[in-house]
Amino acid sequence: MEYSKEFMVRLKEEITSDEGVKLEVYLDHLGYPTVGVGHLIKDTDIEHGQGEGYKITQTRCDELFYQDINICLSECEKQMNEWEHFPEEVKLILANMAFNLGITRLMKFKMMFAALNSGDYKEASIQGLDSRWAKQVYNRA
């Protein structure tokens, strides 16, 4: 699925605001090496094995972000039957949640998806906010 430049810019702005940007390798709250906009370093990344404090450029940060967000959007398309019918605002919210939670955990929001799939966005919002995730990430939610 193609996304407009405006959609991608807004998604990047929102996720960057929520996740923060770190241009050096750090350990996340679980002790995993991470860099950029919450990018979990993989064995195939050039940053792998470099250790905490290894610096990357903003260009590399953007590259990693777009790799991650394209995977995230692809997973949303595959897992959510109604994805293409959701309004852009809903897609932005769900993509942000998927980026933060991972698609597997996001798909456990059964009541929220029931409301979304029936077009009841107010109820979907209530269901999304009535979760442990929303309490943990208060301002983001």
Residue ranges and their predicted role:
Residues 1-24, 39-41, 62, 66-67, ...:
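Long, amphipathic alpha-helical surface segments
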Residues 11, 29-31, 90:
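Residues that flank catalytic or metal-binding motifs in active/ligand-binding sites
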Residues 22-29, 85:
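Catalytic glycan-binding domains that act on GlcNAc-containing polysaccharides
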Residues 27-51:
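Substrate-binding/active-site groove segments that recognize
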Residues 48-82, 88-108, 121:
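Alpha-helical segment that forms one wall of the substrate-binding/catalytic cleft
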